[in-house]
């Protein structure tokens, strides 16, 4: 028993007396162990955080995939609805779509036609060529601009027409019955014109005046103010106090206006203002084309008042009236190539003119083959009509008569004057028959314009047309079509076409066949041209 206790005591003593350094080492080891445990715990926590982040990322990815799937489903549904609508639209006969399609087709046709007219006048000649015509087309398939001959209406002189009462503006007014105008043609029942509105409408053609040659700065207000002032200055306001002008319409492109007066008498007084200066430019004052003297005679005075003070506005008394009145002469059947100066010279063989107007096409500026004139000495009116009527001028026959009534016979005391005038006309006729004697050269006018010749492609088309058509009638030696100079310098003969043949037989056939044919909407004028002038390249000789 003593051994057991003794042994146990030794152990206790040995533990109690263990060195202090061993204790410190053990505590340090325990501390490190705890630190390692803490680091492990932190690592585990970090792993859990990363796992949670990865989980959230996976959830967001799944959400994005779901959104994409939903978008794809929506796109697929829209695509299917679109195709279903298109199929239904095709299958359903919708009237609106048909109308819209027809409108589109008509619009495309108009655009095609406008493009053709702009690019090539050959389309207006009904030549049947495509817009981009190939040069390789055979001649047998090519349609010439000369295929159609002139209509009878196009070669006859245009005479003024007198409308019937049914054609009067007032006759178509609502509330008016046909039996309200039981009078003969050219007469008006004044009882029908009682209401002011109907009177205004029925007299409008006699209350309007044409004013041409306006400056570019002119407008409706300035024209109205000016004519109100000058009408008051000359004493032309015969309808009472106030402005004479009711309305003004201006065509700025062509520089003319229609001025509507408040009364027929004031419109006639305004005719005395022909040649007056408006903003420094002399203007023409004329009756409009719908004016008819026979109908206007029942509505009021057709001549300006003799009491007008024209000197107040710088006009010479005695020039009033211009081309109006019963002594106005119609001159028809003039050769198209006659210039204004040539026609004037012919008419003035009977005396000085008070008024003269060679009627021209507004678009081309070419003569329409007729004119109007009034002589200062009205006594020579019948003499001139009798002397000039029926005279041959080239291949034309003149028709000369009073414009507003049938031809009157000259009085006995005028017979000697008439005989002398006829002899003078016969001499002048020889002067104006240039182109009557056959030559090898034919000159065509009213075929082309300067603008058309500026375009190279159009020029070649016209040249080819001329060669093909002119070659049908004989041995064609040369075709000359003068063109405008790019610098703007004057070039002789622009607007004419010259055809030179090997002999007179060919040129005669060509002149006969081509004269009066339609080319570009105009009747072609074909005359012989002096060979010496053609050889000298003088293309401005009268032809």
UniProtKB/Swiss-Prot annotation:
It comes from the Eukaryota. It holds the Pfam family RRM_1. One of its GO terms (biological process) is spliceosomal complex assembly. CDD domains: RRM1_U2AF65, RRM2_U2AF65, RRM3_U2AF65. GO terms for cellular component: commitment complex; nuclear speck; U2-type prespliceosome; U2AF complex. Keywords: mRNA processing, mRNA splicing, Nucleus, Repeat, RNA-binding. It is found in: Nucleus. Residues 1-171 are annotated as: Disordered. InterPro entries: Nucleotide-bd_a/b_plait_sf, RBD_domain_sf, RRM_dom, U2AF_lg. Residues 1-10 have a biased composition (Gly residues). Gene3D superfamilies: 3.30.70.330. One of its GO terms (molecular function) is poly-pyrimidine tract binding. Residues 207-290, 327-405, 446-532 form the RRM domain. Residues 115-126 have a biased composition (Basic residues). The keyword Repeat applies. Residues 17-78, 88-114 have a biased composition (Basic and acidic residues). N-terminal RS domain has a very strong bias in favor of D over S. Necessary for the splicing of pre-mRNA. Belongs to the splicing factor SR family. This is Splicing factor U2af large subunit B.
């Amino acid at each position: 028993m003593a051994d057991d206790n003794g042994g146990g005591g030794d152990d206790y003593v040995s533990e109690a007396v263990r060195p202090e350094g061993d204790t410190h080492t053990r505590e340090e080891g325990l501390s490190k162990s705890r630190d390692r445990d803490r680091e492990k715990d932190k690592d585990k926590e970090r792993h859990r955080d990363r796992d949670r982040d990865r989980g959230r990322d996976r959830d967001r990815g799944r959400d994005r995939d779901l959104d994409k799937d939903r978008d794809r489903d929506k796109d697929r549904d829209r695509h299917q609805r679109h195709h279903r609508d298109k199929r239904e639209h095709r299958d359903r006969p919708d009237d609106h779509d048909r109308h819209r399609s027809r409108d589109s087709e008509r619009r495309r046709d108009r655009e095609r036609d406008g493009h053709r007219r702009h690019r090539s006048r050959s389309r207006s000649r009904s030549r049947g060529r495509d817009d981009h015509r190939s040069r390789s087309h055979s001649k047998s398939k090519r349609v010439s601009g000369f295929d159609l001959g002139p209509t009878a209406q196009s070669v006859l002189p245009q005479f003024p027409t007198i409308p019937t009462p049914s054609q009067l503006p007032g006759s178509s007014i609502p509330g008016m019955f046909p039996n309200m105008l039981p009078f003969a043609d050219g007469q008006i029942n004044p009882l029908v014109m009682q209401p002011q509105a109907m009177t205004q409408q029925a007299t409008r053609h006699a209350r309007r005046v044409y004013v041409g040659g306006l400056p570019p700065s002119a407008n409706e207000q300035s024209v109205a103010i000016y004519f109100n002032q000058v009408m008051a200055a000359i004493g032309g306001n015969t309808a009472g106090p106030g402005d004479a002008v009711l309305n003004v319409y201006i065509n700025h492109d062509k520089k003319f206006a229609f001025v509507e007066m408040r009364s027929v008498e004031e419109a006639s007084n305004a005719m005395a203002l022909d040649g007056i200066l408006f903003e420094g430019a002399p203007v023409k004052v004329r009756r409009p084309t719908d004016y008819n003297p026979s109908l206007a005679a029942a509505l009021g005075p057709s001549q300006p008042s003799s009491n007008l003070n024209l000197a107040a506005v710088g006009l010479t008394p005695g020039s009033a009236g211009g081309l109006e009145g019963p002594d106005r002469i119609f001159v028809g059947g003039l050769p198209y190539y006659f210039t204004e100066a040539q026609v004037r010279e012919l008419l003035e063989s009977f005396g000085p003119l008070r008024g003269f107007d060679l009627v021209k096409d507004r678009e081309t500026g070419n003569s329409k083959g007729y004119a109007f004139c009034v002589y200062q000495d009205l006594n020579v009116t019948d003499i001139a009509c009798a002397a000039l009527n029926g005279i041959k001028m080239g291949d034309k026959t003149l028709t000369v008569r009073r414009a507003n009534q049938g031809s009157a016979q000259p009085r006995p005391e005028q017979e000697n004057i008439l005989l002398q005038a006829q002899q003078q006309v016969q001499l002048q006729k020889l002067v104006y028959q240039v182109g009557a004697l056959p030559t090898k050269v034919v000159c065509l006018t009213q075929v082309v314009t300067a603008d058309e010749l500026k375009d190279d492609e159009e020029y070649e088309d016209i040249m080819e047309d001329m060669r093909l058509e002119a070659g049908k009638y004989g041995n064609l030696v040369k075709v000359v079509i003068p063109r405008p100079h790019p610098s703007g310098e004057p070039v002789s003969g622009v607007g004419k076409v010259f055809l030179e043949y090997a002999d007179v037989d060919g040129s005669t056939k060509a002149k006969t066949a081509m004269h009066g044919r339609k080319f570009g909407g105009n009747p072609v004028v074909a005359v012989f041209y002096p060979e010496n002038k053609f050889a000298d390249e003088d293309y401005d000789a009268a032809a």
